């Protein structure tokens, strides 16, 4: 979704190990049926919804197009699927499709979002429409791909309640995975709720980048005998072990000497946009070079009229306490650039903003 595409070398141990980790945390059983609608050229699709059910011997029902919400819903209903994985982008489409009845998703016991940040408005709208909670996970192709995941709460053998999820986080590290938060310059490990670079270690960490030793050395670091993947993500871990993603380090704009998170701006804007049930409004915040400020923030938004922009500008001015976070420009575009995996294309968005 950003930078030049790289080939990621995943070994048999990486893939089999992560598939086993995933199966363990979601407690797959012989009665489970998983929906296989994610692209197979994407680590989430090939490992979680293809290899994992094959290895575990559970049923997988496939659909070729994850953007076809009604087709996916019919599949879930017909085969009484119990597990569905997707992205925030795809789940958003399902909430807008008025042909999908809540009963079509009734059999699902677990819905997991990954690959990109789960937008709060999507989570809330999905729960409102279908009565189902979306649990957010986190990882990267370089981690085969799952490193952490939120899960439903459950009753322990001693009848205490095990908290499996916290909204706004990406869950706890999955078994066999170590996540550290470190200072991005010194790699000194930081404390609880301190924000820094996220490092991941475990059986799922890749061998390296294909025919690119230089780049591999930049992202794999050995600490106390363990190999860690340097994610490029800024985050923190709370007192209960739940991981929160702040943003990509590359998704910060420097204005007035202050580092501004583009993701944080998106979070604020998502709370200001009033989505109607049939609304196709989509947006992304990016930054481009500016002669005066060095950088300027641009909001790209689709499927709106000029009158809507005027109202949105007023809301932004009223609700943004940090004035540096206010977009310098709002551009109406036909569509927000997306990759085949459903992720927003940050590079294409930056070009579109110029």
Predicted ranges, named:
Residues 81-86, 95-165, 178:
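Gly/Ser/Thr-rich phosphate-binding loop
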Residues 295, 320-344:
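AMP-binding/adenylate-forming catalytic domain of the ANL superfamily
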Residues 84, 202, 207-208, 227, ...:
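AMP-binding/adenylate-forming catalytic core of the ANL superfamily
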């Amino acid at each position: 979704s950003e930078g030049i595409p790289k080939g990621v070398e995943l070994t048999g141990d990486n893939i089999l190990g992560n598939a086993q980790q995933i199966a363990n945390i979601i407690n797959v059983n012989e009665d489970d049926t998983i929906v296989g609608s994610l692209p197979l050229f994407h680590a989430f699709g090939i490992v979680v919804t293809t290899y994992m059910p094959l290895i575990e011997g559970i049923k997988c029902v496939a659909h070729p197009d994850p953007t076809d919400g009604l087709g996916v819903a019919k599949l879930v209903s017909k085969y009484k699927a119990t597990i569905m994985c997707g992205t925030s982008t795809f789940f958003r489409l399902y909430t807008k499709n008025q042909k999908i009845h809540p009963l079509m998703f009734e059999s699902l016991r677990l819905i997991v979002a990954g690959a990109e940040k789960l937008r709060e408005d999507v989570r809330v709208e999905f729960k409102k429409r279908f009565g189902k909670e979306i649990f957010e996970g986190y990882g990267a192709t370089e981690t085969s791909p799952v490193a952490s995941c939120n899960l439903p709460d459950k009753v322990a053998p001693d009848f205490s309640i095990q908290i499996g999820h916290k909204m706004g986080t990406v869950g706890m590290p999955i078994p066999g995975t170590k996540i550290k938060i470190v200072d991005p310059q010194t790699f000194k490990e930081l404390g609880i709720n301190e924000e820094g670079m996220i490092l991941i270690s475990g059986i799922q960490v890749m061998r390296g980048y294909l025919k690119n030793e230089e780049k591999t050395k930049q992202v794999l670091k050995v600490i106390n005998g363990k190999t860690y993947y340097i994610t490029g993500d800024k985050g923190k871990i709370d007192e209960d072990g739940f991981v929160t993603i702040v943003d990509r380090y590359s998704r910060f704009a420097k204005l007035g000497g202050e580092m501004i998170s583009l993701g944080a701006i998106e979070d604020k804007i998502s709370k200001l946009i009033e989505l109607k049930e049939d609304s196709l409004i989509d947006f992304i915040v990016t930054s481009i070079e500016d002669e005066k400020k060095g950088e300027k923030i641009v909001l790209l938004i689709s499927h709106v009229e000029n009158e809507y922009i005027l109202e949105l500008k007023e809301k932004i001015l009223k609700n943004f306490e940090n004035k540096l976070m206010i977009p310098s420009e709002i551009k109406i575009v036909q569509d927000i650039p997306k990759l085949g995996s459903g992720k927003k294309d940050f590079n294409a968005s930056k070009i579109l903003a110029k």
